[in-house]
């Protein structure tokens, strides 16, 4: 489950007097119990959970309420660490570390990290070789770089204060970031002193500052999966290169005797051209010189492509896909057990000495004020009731295990009426009821599908009959008006029959509304002759996407596509980080190398040739445009690298650069191809895994269960509401909480109700699907995890001098990470 980042910000803001004041007991909802010494009253695998108020951190005379507030906050931190998959050895160990932890975990710090990283990356636009329009003087960009690096130093100092030196040096990613920071600092000072730029390949390492940002957690996960998939990938890659070298040697002996064949005249050229042939960029050109001399030579190339391209490359995808599946399952298992351990830590900080059997509502309410500060008092109580499956005054550990799933619910009062028009006069009710029945009928839906299909065919025929040039008519086509009228009538009928809220709650209805609105804007653009907005008319074919709802497989494809969009964005950002690093290296070594007529001595001279010659009275220009694919600045480098990713004619760029530098330049292009092949293979494997997973789940579950979200129904009685209201009044709770509770009470009295039903909703995540897919194995994982915790407890229970705490210190977390 993803972290609600808005709640992280307010964690530090909850340290004021209003929220830290302990609630007084009322009506049995909570009693003033003393927290146990270690945050819990039970002995078990997690009985050694540390507390920020233990040891010398809390004075002997401190009131019990202060201890509870600290326990609430630390329990909330444990839950956040479980949700964010943060290792428990980074847990703040004392009040001083807690202050730094709270500062580091808020949106201000996150934005500071992100903006600093972006500033460092964007400096490549201004540094030599710079984009001409954005070039800055050396002292300006060097000063900006030093400023950004000083901010990074401040960030690392705050993390050092939070983690402590020993934990700080154990954190690998932080140490890598620190090492890069030192190198960047030295280089920036040298540039500022010398007032000139030098070869700075280490600028390619600036991506680490972006990758380490909190908002780029998806990029870190992608990089981790790429590195985890490398061992099997490298095995198949070595096999591929082995066959390539064997065929290169064979090709050299077979075709080097042909003087008209430049592809195999040396062993180096044989290897390079077979590597390019693997991408099919130079096929069949590479075959034609030998094929013209001996037709049987085609067998060599057919066998090579069959083995390398169609067998080993597909085998590579299969191996990566299998490894990716195992990694995804292992990742789900690790995160599930990590969350379970975090819940155990939080639970033992919330049980009291008087009530060691569970968490009272008072303690749960205190936890949620820190864990979900934006959650209202009514929502906190409903969350408690949703968790409390045993209907007892105390929340057991078994019930508390569902805290992540239940805390994400959005609660709303259940409407007493079925439709929005139920309270209208009878005549209006019958009209809207008929419209509701009509728009929900199968006949109406299939009629609209037929209209969309006819519209699609009409657009296709209309476009086919158009000529080149100005294809936008000066008058509005009658077909445009007819179909737009039908779509508009459908929109108004659905809004009238379903109600605006229910209509807009459907993703497909939102899509229909957007396309119809754009079509109406296109009509205005045609009517008012607004040429700059004619592009809106081209969006009409988007209506055809509605036809994908007809077939279940199409719906699954579209649903999978929409589910993949956030992850695909992070994968795209991961690819851009590789682009940035390779672009920096390319600029340092190849900047200014390519120009018109630069490669006349190479085999790709025609692609770079620029010739003016006169034919009669006219000057004719023969221009090869490949000199534009250069590394003269960061923007040109990104375009060039994208062309290399597509692989069509990528060898022309490689050979052009090689002719102006050295043969070793080919290593840069080959390495880039291999790296992008790894990333692209991971992307394909991810898409396959997500689609196959959804297909398997849809076979095991009902279709409605797959498409619908999570819905929980809970009832709140008037007595419970009055008790919570009294509790918050006596505790001087926030005015917004009291106001919402009074609004709910007035609504009950208005309709003379003794209770009110609330619905908790949230979208179904992949974690929910995985819980059902692996439900048989999950119990085995839990049992194995419990045994590991017991063994760890036995190992940690032996007394040793190292286990004795000094005054002012705090016991470290003994959790399995």
Swiss-Prot record:
Q: What's the catalysed reaction?
A: Na(+)(in) = Na(+)(out); Ca(2+)(in) = Ca(2+)(out)
| One MF term in the entry's GO annotations | syntaxin binding
Please give the coiled-coil regions recorded for this protein: 770-794
> Topology relative to the membrane, per the entry?
Multi-pass membrane protein
Q: Which domain of life is it from?
A: Eukaryota
Localization annotation: Lysosome membrane; Endosome membrane; Early endosome membrane; Recycling endosome membrane
Q: Where is the composition biased (Polar residues)?
A: 802-817
Q: How is it modified after translation?
A: N-glycosylated.
| Swiss-Prot/TrEMBL GO biological process terms | endocytosis involved in viral entry into host cell; positive regulation of autophagy; sodium ion transmembrane transport
Q: Which stretch is the leader sequence? A: none
The answer to whether the entry has keyword Membrane is yes
* Regions of this protein lying in the Cytoplasmic compartment: 1-101, 159-172, 222-235, 320-445, 502-504, 551-574, 693-817
Q: What does this protein do?
A: Intracellular channel initially characterized as a non-selective Ca(2+)-permeable channel activated by NAADP (nicotinic acid adenine dinucleotide phosphate), it is also a voltage-gated highly-selective Na(+) channel activated directly by PI(3,5)P2 (phosphatidylinositol 3,5-bisphosphate) that senses pH changes and confers electrical excitability to organelles. Localizes to the early and recycling endosomes membranes where it plays a role in the uptake and processing of proteins and regulates organellar membrane excitability, membrane trafficking and pH homeostasis.
Which named protein is this?
Two pore calcium channel protein 1
The organism of origin for this protein: Rattus norvegicus (Rat)
């Amino acid at each position: 489950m993803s972290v609600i980042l808005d709640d992280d910000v307010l964690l530090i803001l909850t340290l004021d007097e209003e929220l830290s004041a302990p609630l007084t007991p009322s009506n049995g909802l909570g009693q003033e119990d003393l927290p146990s010494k270690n945050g819990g009253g039970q002995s078990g695998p997690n009985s050694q959970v540390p507390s920020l108020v233990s040891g010398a951190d809390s004075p002997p005379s401190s009131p019990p309420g202060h201890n509870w507030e600290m326990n609430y906050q630390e329990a909330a931190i444990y839950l956040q660490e479980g949700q964010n998959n943060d290792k428990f050895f980074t847990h703040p160990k004392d009040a001083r570390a807690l202050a730094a932890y709270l500062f580091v975990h808020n949106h201000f710090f996150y934005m500071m990290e992100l903006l600093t990283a972006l500033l460092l990356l964007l400096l490549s636009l201004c540094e030599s070789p710079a984009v001409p329009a954005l070039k800055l003087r050396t002292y300006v960009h060097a000063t900006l770089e030093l400023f950004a690096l000083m901010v990074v130093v401040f960030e690392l100092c705050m993390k050092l204060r939070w983690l402590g030196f020993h934990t700080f040096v154990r954190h690998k990613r932080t140490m890598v970031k620190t090492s890069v920071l030192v190198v960047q600092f030295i280089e920036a000072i040298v540039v500022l002193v010398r007032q000139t730029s030098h070869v700075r390949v280490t600028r390619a390492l600036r991506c680490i500052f972006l990758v380490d940002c909190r908002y780029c957690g998806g990029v870190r996960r992608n990089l981790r999966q790429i590195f985890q998939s490398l061992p099997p990938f490298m095995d198949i890659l070595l096999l591929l290169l082995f066959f390539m070298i064997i065929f290169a040697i064979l090709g050299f002996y077979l075709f080097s005797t042909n003087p008209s064949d430049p592809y195999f005249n040396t062993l180096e050229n044989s290897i390079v051209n077979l590597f390019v042939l693997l991408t099919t960029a130079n096929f069949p050109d590479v075959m034609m010189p030998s094929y013209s001399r001996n037709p049987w030579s085609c067998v060599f190339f057919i066998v090579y492509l069959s083995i390398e391209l169609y067998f080993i490359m597909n085998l590579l995808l299969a191996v990566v896909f299998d490894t990716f599946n195992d990694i995804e399952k292992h990742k789900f298992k690790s995160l599930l057990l990590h969350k379970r351990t975090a819940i155990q830590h939080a639970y033992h900080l919330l049980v009291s000495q008087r009530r060691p059997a569970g968490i009272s509502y008072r303690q749960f309410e205190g936890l949620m004020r820190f864990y979900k500060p934006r959650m209202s008092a009514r929502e906190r109580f409903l969350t408690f009731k949703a968790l409390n499956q045993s209907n007892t005054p105390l929340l057991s550990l078994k019930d508390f295990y569902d805290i992540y799933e239940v805390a994400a619910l959005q609660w709303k009062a259940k409407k007493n009426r079925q439709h929005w028009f139920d309270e209208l006069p009878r005549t209006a009710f019958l009209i809207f009821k008929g419209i509701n029945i009509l728009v929900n009928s199968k006949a109406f839906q299939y009629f609209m599908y037929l209209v969309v299909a006819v519209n699609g065919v009409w657009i296709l025929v209309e476009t086919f009959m158009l000529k080149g040039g100005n294809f936008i008519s000066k008058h509005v086509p009658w077909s445009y008006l007819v179909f737009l009228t039908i779509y508009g009538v459908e929109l108004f009928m659905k809004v009238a029959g379903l109600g605006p809220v229910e209509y807009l709650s459907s993703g497909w209805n939102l899509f229909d509304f957007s396309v119809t609105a754009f079509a109406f804007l296109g009509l205005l653009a045609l009517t008012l002759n607004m040429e700059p907005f004619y592009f809106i008319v081209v969006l009409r074919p988007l209506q055809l996407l509605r036809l994908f709802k007809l077939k279940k497989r199409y719906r699954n494809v579209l649903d999978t596509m929409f589910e993949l969009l956030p992850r695909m964005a992070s994968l795209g950002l991961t690819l851009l980080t590789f682009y940035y690093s390779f672009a920096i290296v390319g600029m340092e070594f190849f900047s200014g190398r390519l120009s018109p007529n630069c490669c006349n001595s190479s085999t790709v001279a025609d692609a770079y040739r620029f010739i003016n010659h006169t034919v009669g009275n006219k000057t004719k220009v023969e221009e090869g445009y490949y000199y534009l694919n250069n590394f003269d600045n960061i923007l040109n480098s990104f375009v060039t690298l994208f062309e290399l990713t597509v692989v069509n004619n990528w060898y022309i760029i490689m050979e052009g650069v090689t002719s102006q530098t050295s043969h070793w330049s080919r290593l840069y292009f080959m390495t880039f191809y291999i790296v992008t092949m790894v990333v692209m293979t991971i992307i394909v494997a991810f898409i396959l895994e997500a689609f196959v997973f959804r297909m398997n789940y849809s076979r095991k579950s009902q279709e409605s269960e797959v498409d619908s979200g999570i819905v929980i129904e809970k009832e709140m009685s008037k007595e419970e509401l009055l008790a919570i209201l009294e509790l918050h009044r006596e505790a001087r709770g926030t005015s917004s909480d009291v106001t919402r509770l009074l609004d709910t009470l007035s609504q009950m009295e208005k309709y003379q109700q003794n209770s009110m039903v609330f619905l908790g909703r949230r979208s179904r995540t992949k974690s929910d699907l995985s819980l059902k897919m692996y439900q048989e194995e999950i119990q085995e994982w839990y049992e194995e995890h419990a045994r590991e915790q017991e063994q760890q407890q036995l190992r940690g229970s032996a007394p040793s001098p190292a286990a004795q705490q000094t005054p002012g210190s705090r016991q470290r977390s003994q959790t399995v990470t």
